A protein has these predicted regions:
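Conserved phosphate-binding catalytic cores of ATP/NTP-utilizing and phosphoryl-transfer enzymes
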Residues: 1-6, 187-221, 379-380, 430-448
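Phosphate/ATP-binding catalytic cores across multiple sugar-kinase/actin-like superfamilies
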Residues: 134-150, 197-209, 338-386, 404, ...
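Gly/Thr-rich phosphate-binding beta-strand-loop-beta motif of the actin/hexokinase/Hsp70
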Residues: 2-30, 203-244, 290, 400, ...
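Acidic, glycine/GT-rich loop-and beta-edge segments that sit at the periphery of enzyme/chaperone cores
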Residues: 2-5, 13-15, 35-38, 212-213, ...
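Early-domain small/polar-rich strand-loop-helix modules and first-structured segments
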Residues: 1-112, 186-188, 193, 241-244, ...
Length: 920
């Protein structure tokens, strides 16, 4: 992008469809024009289309030939984007990537990993970021092919994102653009873009504001393929200006949810007719067919029904095809009753532990009723009157849905009557058109929507009571592009090592900088359900490089760049430097469920740290053997009651005396045990990634007293306890080291005979291996196969329950901390479970819980085991004392209780801490 760019390009990067529009900045008539995107519409056939379907198809060796996927600008292209990708995906869903935008926001998977198409057995896959980048790259290359004299890299580009996207999701979008070869881009919220398109739709010389009375409140009601966005825009008292006054929170609720609901109804009929449930890929094919049927029925008012075909796979391909149909009446009933029910204004979204997760575990909104989410939005922002509604998104094409929303608003505001519907002739294109128009606004040639940032930002701070239960407002809502807000509060930080701040946002609070507010649990509460509406973002981290100084006093500054991105800076009050803080995308993975986990270190922690230094350095009477008891006495609490912050402070103290572990075997064993206990489970606190890196340096150094069994035991225990903080590469390295002992080759068996690990060592090795959730699937399969082999060696191998526990961890359906994309496929896990069910269980209570983890239901067909196998397991579990609860884990989608989580992990957790899967 340059300041003299000829074209202003707006890109609607949609979940289901993308679109591009532009303005020629050098033309006398600066009107918005659609860019018809060249794309493959049939094998070997290129044609321009007004929309670019946001689908990717990864062509195989036999389905599409090289000439059929070639593009004019890339003859060797094998990844198809657009119309052909959508059509071909209906035939081979295992090669199609859909809803990449939703996956980009899914914190439960590694968004850098090649995991899409989800649940597919095909070897070629893409990461969510690379899938989004492929769509953006297609736009760039298509533009360059049709505008040879105006390369895309030289134009000013605006890319839209949902208004509800947090800063982490926006940063991932920027990364996708960078991978697509884009220069700096401007991010614009989709509802604002839709409103800009409405402004631009008025004839030249006619002011859009004149169409609305001064003080009017306009609701932009935007439902796309993957998200629902509510934005409130008010008309200024002068009748000349617009202000964005409120935005809703992130809702993964859109057309995809309709497709899923429709597919579930069709599947019920198919199963009733054939007696067989669809497998994961057949289900994906059905969902895609229902998506196409929905689009057909909504786009063609003359068609009353659409045929649905689900082809069988493998041995079922011939004669395995199943057919049904979707009628217009069925679709409208689902939409009106399920997604747009008429409700009382006080009705709020239902909160459950998960909504639809049939499409690969995407974290969809638990309550599909859009009207309930709308009621919550209006209540939260204290909106009593809506004067006009601008509908946007393909999902709002049916007039019946728009009437339902208008009628609902009218029922909520009888004293004001029904709001007026603002005309939007092309809701599927308006966002791209508005984004291009915004380029003119940035040049001072159009009406700007004021309001700045939709959220206020807060930094975690200890209150006067020493508790980290408050945050201080660092930047208010409404910061405009190019503006900054400085927090008049000093922070004293350690230099030359990582420092971190907890960062929060709120879309509803109106605090001024410096205001203290309660944090709550870091999750925005529904109205009436708590005293906090702060949403916790990934923490912001940096290293303050200041040679010769151990500490620095700094102040924070929040800036909104000219491109609309959030930046947080740390400025030295002594004027010696400034540091930009970046979002730690790998942070998280643990939820603090009570104030014990949120608290600052115990006030007596400095004294406790001194005990650690004394015990290991030999500077006083305290010896390592008596250290833990001394720490409990000093902190006046049992070790399992120490808060997360206290534990990490003690770990940091232990790290400072790492060299002292070499003094004796007892020093080393006690030091390793202390580190494992105080850093467990390796995540949950900011800077845990850095702490784990410091421990990995110890791993590479190895044991100082390798011949001492106590040291060898402590060695494996520490890596098991902190595995949650390890990267996949570190876990694979640990696996390779252990595999030589646990899965030895013929040559390694001879070496193993020389080492002769004790039974206790072998048990700790297995526990460590089983806790490595980030291992590749292939490594887990090798490990699980070996455990099943050992279980089959005889009754003695099944008596203590260790092998059962290990199998439950290795093949568990729901990770405790790792990404779901490394879960063992259900086919292999099913084989393991079937083998275990054929064995006797000497101690059923020791086997029952891990086998429940192996067969646990997730709601994700790419992970769930066969229904009949789970039914066998459920019956077996019910025969065990307390087995009703375990059977429920297998029969239903339910979360683990804290006690069950500890059993699954094989360890205790710091007070108040709960594990969550990876948030990347």
């Amino acid at each position: 992008m340059t300041s003299r760019a000829r074209y202003l390009v707006g890109i609607d990067l949609g979940t289901t469809n993308s679109a591009v529009a532009f303005v020629d900045g050098q033309a006398a008539d600066k009107r918005v024009t659609l860019f018809d995107v060249p794309q493959l519409v049939a094998p070997g056939e290129i044609a321009p289309r007004r929309q670019l379907p946001s689908f990717l198809y990864l062509a195989g060796e036999h389905d599409l030939g090289p000439a059929e996927t070639a593009l004019p600008w890339d003859r060797a292209r094998r990844t198809v984007v657009g119309e052909l990708a959508r059509a071909q995906g209906a035939r081979m869903p295992e090669r199609m990537i859909a809803s990449a935008k939703s996956w980009l926001c899914h914190a439960g998977v590694d968004r850098q990993a090649a995991i899409l198409p989800w649940g597919s057995d095909e070897p070629e896959k893409l990461s969510p970021i690379d899938a989004q980048a492929a769509i953006l790259e297609h736009v760039r290359q298509a533009w360059d092919a049709t505008h040879p004299g105006a390369p895309f890299a030289s134009q000013e580009v605006m890319v839209t994102v949902p208004a509800s996207f947090d800063e982490a999701a926006r940063e991932l979008t920027l990364e996708a653009a960078r991978r697509a070869g884009y220069g700096p881009i401007v991010l614009l919220e989709e509802p604002q873009a839709a409103f800009y398109a409405w402004v631009d739709s008025h004839p030249a010389g006619e002011r859009a504001a004149a169409a609305l009375a001064p003080g009017s409140q306009v609701l932009v009601f935007d439902i796309g393929g993957g998200t629902t966005d509510f934005t409130l825009i008010s008309v200024g008292a002068d009748g000349e200006s617009f202000d964005r006054t409120a935005v809703g929170d992130h809702l993964l609720l859109g057309g995809d949810n309709v497709d899923l609901t429709l597919a579930k109804q069709v599947e019920q009929r198919l199963v009733a007719a054939s007696g067989r449930k669809l497998d994961a890929l057949e289900w994906h094919g059905l969902v895609h067919s229902c998506r196409l049927a929905k689009e057909t029925l909504l786009g063609d008012q003359t068609q009353e029904s659409v045929a649905i075909t689900v082809a069988g796979r493998g041995s079922r391909l011939i004669g395995g095809t199943r057919r049904d149909q979707v009628s217009r009446d069925e679709l409208e009933l689902i939409l009106l009753d399920g997604f747009f029910p008429l409700i009382e204004r006080g009705a709020l979204p239902q909160r459950t532990r998960g909504g639809l997760s049939e499409l690969g575990g995407l974290p969809y909104a638990a309550d599909p009723a859009v009207t309930r989410h709308l009621a919550s939005f209006l209540h939260r922002h204290e909106v009593s009157r809506i004067d006009a509604v601008l509908f946007n998104g393909g999902a709002m094409t049916p007039a019946a849905l728009r009437r339902r929303v208008v009628d609902q608003l009218a029922a909520w505001q009888p004293e004001h009557g029904a709001p007026r519907e603002l005309a939007n002739r092309t809701p599927e294109l308006a966002v791209a058109q508005g984004a291009a128009y915004y380029g003119l606004v940035r040049r001072g040639l159009g009406a700007r929507i004021r309001g700045g940032t939709a959220r206020a930002f807060y930094v975690g701070a200890a209150s006067t009571g020493g508790r980290s239960d408050t945050a201080v407002c660092a930047a208010p809502k409404g910061l405009e592009e190019g503006e900054a807000a400085a927090l008049a509060r000093d922070f004293e930080l350690v230099t030359n090592r990582p420092v971190s701040f907890r960062l929060f946002s709120s879309s509803s609070r109106e605090d001024e900088p410096g205001a203290l507010v309660p944090i709550g649990d870091g999750t925005p509460d529904l109205v009436g359900e708590g005293d906090s509406d702060l949403l916790e973002l990934p923490p912001i981290v940096t290293v303050l490089r200041a040679p010769g100084r151990s500490r620095a006093t700094v102040r924070l500054e929040v800036r909104i760049t000219e491109l609309g991105a959030l930046e947080v800076w740390c400025r030295d009050t002594g004027g010696e430097g400034q540091w930009r803080l970046s979002f730690d995308m790998r942070a998280g993975g643990a939820a603090r469920e009570n104030e014990a986990a949120q608290s600052d270190p115990d006030p007596r922690t400095p004294e406790a740290r001194g005990l650690i230094a004394q015990a290991f350095s030999g500077s006083g009477p305290l010896k390592p053997a008596g250290l833990m008891k001394a720490l409990e006495e000093t902190l006046a609490a049992r070790r399992d009651e120490w808060s997360l912050a206290t534990l990490r402070a003690l770990f940091d103290a232990a790290l400072e005396v790492e060299e002292e572990r070499r003094r004796s075997p007892d020093h080393e064993a006690r030091w390793l045990n202390l580190c494992g206990f105080t850093l467990r489970p390796g995540r949950g606190a900011t800077l845990d990634e850095w702490r784990t890196r410091q421990m990995w340096r110890v791993f590479n150094l190895g044991l100082a007293h390798e011949k001492a069994e106590a040291c060898r035991l402590a060695w494996w225990i520490v890596w098991r306890r902190i595995a949650g903080g390890m990267t996949q590469g570190q876990q694979e390295q640990l696996y390779d080291r252990l595999a030589q002992l646990f899965l030895p080759s013929f040559k390694q068996k001879k070496k193993l005979a020389e080492i002769k690990p004790t039974r206790e060592e072998t048990a700790e090795m297995l526990r460590t291996l089983a806790n490595l959730e980030r291992l590749t699937v292939s490594s887990k399969i090798k490990l699980g196969d070996e455990v099943v082999r050992r279980l089959g060696e005889g009754r003695k191998a099944r008596e203590d329950g260790l092998n059962f526990w290990a199998l439950g961890r290795i093949g568990g359906r729901v990770p405790l901390y790792g990404p779901v994309n490394t879960v063992v496929p259900p086919q292999r896990a099913g084989e393991w479970l079937a083998a275990a069910l054929d064995m006797d269980w000497p101690d059923p209570e020791k086997a029952a819980f891990p086998m429940a983890q192996l067969g646990r239901r997730t709601g994700d067909r790419a992970r769930d085991l066969d229904d009949d196998l789970r039914a066998r397991l459920s019956a077996r579990l019910r025969a065990v004392p307390g087995g009703e609860r375990l059977a429920r884990l297998v029969d239903e989608v339910v979360a683990l209780e804290a006690r069950e989580e500890r059993v699954a992990l094989g360890d205790t957790l710091p007070a108040g801490l709960r594990l969550l899967p990876d948030s990347d």
